[in-house]
Each structure stands twice: as C-alpha cells, then as structure tokens.
Amino acid sequence: MFLTQGVIAERLTGKSWEENIKERFFAPLGMDRSNVSIKELENSTNAALGYELYKDSVLRKMPYYKIAAMAPAGSINSSVNEMAKWLKVWINNGKYNNRVKFNF
C-alpha cells in the first residue's frame, strides 16, 4: 500500500519519492539527520549499527538491508529526536511548533 502511495505521489508531483520526502517533510521539520537511502546512511557519521553472532562465536557487523526498490514502504533512516518531530505533527493534526505545516 505505501509503495503504491509513493508511486502516486511521484506521478502527481513529477518528483521522486525521495525528493518529496526531503522537501515536504524533512526540510519543514528541520529533520537534518534523516535520510532515505542506504548510501546516505552509510555516509552518516552517527548511525547505529546492527550486529549478529556468526557461527555462534564471532560477533560481526550486519550489512544494512537495501530496500530501495520499495522505498516508500519503509526506507527512512532517522533518529529518535527527529522521528519525535514527525510524531508531533500527527498527534497535533498537522501542526508543528504552533504553526500549520501539513494538511491531512
């Protein structure tokens, strides 16, 4: 469902899903550390890493799961603080910092 919504948004705006997210959500909310690709995440200086136990004895870094082909279904990388901004918009019916930012 989210993938379909992303494709519809691309068709309506003439911009990629990634461009729409950055311009319409990240920028207005000041979500400067959030990104929408594994490449951006890997280039980040402050990203959490996942680890796994390999063959029951070796702890090793897990590769990031690349889901670019279905990005609108969950390819946003963010911090707790920045996701809290997004949640405030939803909780406050589109308002953020006492200003209307989004119409749902």
Named regions from a protein language model:
Residues 1-104:
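Short, surface-exposed loop or secondary-structure junction motifs
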